[in-house]
Amino acid sequence: MSHSTPVYSIMYRRLEKLVELIWLPGTQSMTDDDFKDTLTVFAECGLQHRARRLIIDMREFKHRPGPEVQVFRDEVIMPKYVQAGVEKLAWIWPGESGDWITKSAGGTYYNRYFDTADQALSWLATTQ
């Protein structure tokens, strides 16, 4: 990535076993390769810390990934979440709603959309 404007921030919260990805406004100029690189860094962080919970804040996300990115996410990224031991993934994405279970070779994890970070963190703090 050769951006002068930051495109993301990743934080690890040890006590919560949580890794958080916050997309920043610089995503407007990112490429699909930049997007895939960021997802890889996020997934590797989850693996490194054996994260049980993930949160992705989409409020400032401006990039529109191409269709091949979904294949990459399904085949490369989601198995890393399962390998890390992820149980829940919260999406902060105002206007979206719903929840679902992601099934990948070796495991599953729960997903849910939220309007605010507080709502997402509250859900992540509960047990299944």
What are these regions (language model features)?
Residues M1-Q128:
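Amphipathic, Lys/Arg-enriched alpha-helical "gate/interface" segment within cytosolic domains
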